[in-house]
Amino acid sequence: MKYRTHKCNELSLDHVGEHVRLSGWVHRYRNHGGVVFIDLRDRFGITQIVCRQEENPELHQLMDQVRSEWVLCVEGLVCARLEGMENPNLVTGSIEVEVSSLEVLSRAQNLPFSISDEHINVNEELRLTYRYLDMRRGDILDRLMCRHKVMLACRQYLDEQGFTEVVTPILGKSTPEGARDYLVPSRIYPGNFYALPQSPQLFKQILMVGGLDRYFQIATCFRDEDLRADRQPEFTQIDMEMSFGGPEDLFPVVEELVTRLFAVKGIELKAPFLRMTYQEAKDSYGTDKPDLRFGLRLKNCCEYARKFTFSIFLDQLAHGGTVKGFCVPGGADMSRKQLDIYTDFVKRYGSMGLVWIKKQDGGVSSNVAKFASEDVFQEMFEAFEAKDQDILLLIAAPEAVANQALDHLRRLIAKERQLYDSTQYNFVWITDFPLFAKEEGELCPEHHPFTAPLDEDISLLDSDPFAVRSSSYDLVLNGYEIASGSQRIHNPDLQNKIFALLKLSQESVKEKFGFFIDALSFGTPPHLGIALGLDRIMMVLTGAETIREVIAFPKTQKAGDLMMSAPSEILPIQLKELGLKL
């Protein structure tokens, strides 16, 4: 049986007089007395079909029984709609199909939510439980189609650049990479476990040892971590690695790749992208993921804070803290109530409060006005280049607390005051991250233990490891990290030294990374790589609020699959076969 001669978006006035066959879902149904109208929908569009009782009573009776989301196959004659009855909102709005035969291919039970009315808000848990129905509402399928085109563009470009797509193993060895592993018990080796990959990191580096030169993969990765709006337990990244190069070789490749991906949506980007060191980003924006669509740059105010008699300023400065903030143009219109709300907001991030200083009619209005002279306030206005009716917002706190609080406050105010264009795309490379972070007083990798230190900082590894910068880089878009990578360590002695600084014993290194150290010992080319978060890129490209909206079958924020009721218990016999007990 031939189910269709045309898709539901293809018919026009050029087809008037033709007999056609269409298949699809009942999108909307209307019975106007002796005339039944049905909007028939497939993935491509909608066509109106019609049956008149006086012309075909039996068919009219059958169509009168049809309900929403039934699947039909219809045959009929393409006719022009009557003048004034055209629908300009449909590609096929100038025609309709007068049905001569109809077959019900599948019936649908009562729907848990409306498919035809996309504007009705539906509880997300209900949508995820019936994901297949949610897909029919339009946005999800559109995003999946966009994702498909983005992946095609990715493969085509990287192939042009000499990258080879290689699929690396899903079942691998558990190695410390930051987050918890998802573990898979082995039936063949009782008591032993595979780990699902948090990334193909070691495999892609070993491919460079093997001489592949340039590798890529659209890889599925797994991390058992707490979820946020932009995280999933399983996610997809565009994974890349290349030999005999440095960041100056990689950056143009990635910039052109991103440009091609955005071109899928008709968005034109300008390269090269801005670059900023980690320290510059922290100093000016309070974060290593700055949103550069708006100003509100942070400024260190310690020089002026020392001239205050305000105890909170002086106490923070005496104990190594900082005083910093930003200027909001025209912000002097903020009410005391609004400023109290902002004060409560920054307290969530550990700040003791919020200092505000308004420049109004050449004078000063501030909640710390009595703690400094007029001259000090004027010096601060000059430093911030504040104009009349601007406001300065300051925080006195330890550096990390001040940065975090001001970063969030800056974003909140920019959103509330509409200081940026949501269709603007501001990319920035963040470079020169610290090689190590501090966790409970101990060294831990800022990115991962395979990141190379900058050559000029290697001498500091023994004397001042926290001062060592890494040859690593993140690509940030509008406050989202969409890619992260680094130059890799290709010297086994240096790699062992990094492991030792991380207090991994020789036995532990041999057990977890022995195969990798062996590989590095057989002639390893200098190499580097990067991974782009495909889900996050799609989230930005399609305007989705969460990455769940750009994944066909996402997990909830509690890592559950509501449609399949996973995770679920398994049978005792399955546990026994695996040699496990609960």
Curated annotation (Swiss-Prot):
It comes from the Bacteria. Aspartyl-tRNA synthetase with relaxed tRNA specificity since it is able to aspartylate not only its cognate tRNA(Asp) but also tRNA(Asn). Reaction proceeds in two steps: L-aspartate is first activated by ATP to form Asp-AMP and then transferred to the acceptor end of tRNA(Asp/Asn). This is Aspartate--tRNA(Asp/Asn) ligase. Its main location: cytoplasm. Belongs to the class-II aminoacyl-tRNA synthetase family. Type 1 subfamily. L-aspartate binds at residues 177, 223, 447, 488. One of its GO terms (molecular function) is ATP binding. Residues 201-204 are annotated as: Aspartate. It holds the Pfam family GAD. Gene3D superfamilies: Bira Bifunctional Protein, Domain 2, GAD-like domain, Nucleic acid-binding proteins. The keyword Aminoacyl-tRNA synthetase applies. InterPro entries: Aa-tRNA-synt_II, aa-tRNA-synth_II, aa-tRNA-synth_II/BPL/LPL, Asp-tRNA-ligase_1, Asp-tRNA-ligase_1_N, Asp/Asn-tRNA-synth_IIb, AspRS_core, GAD-like_sf.
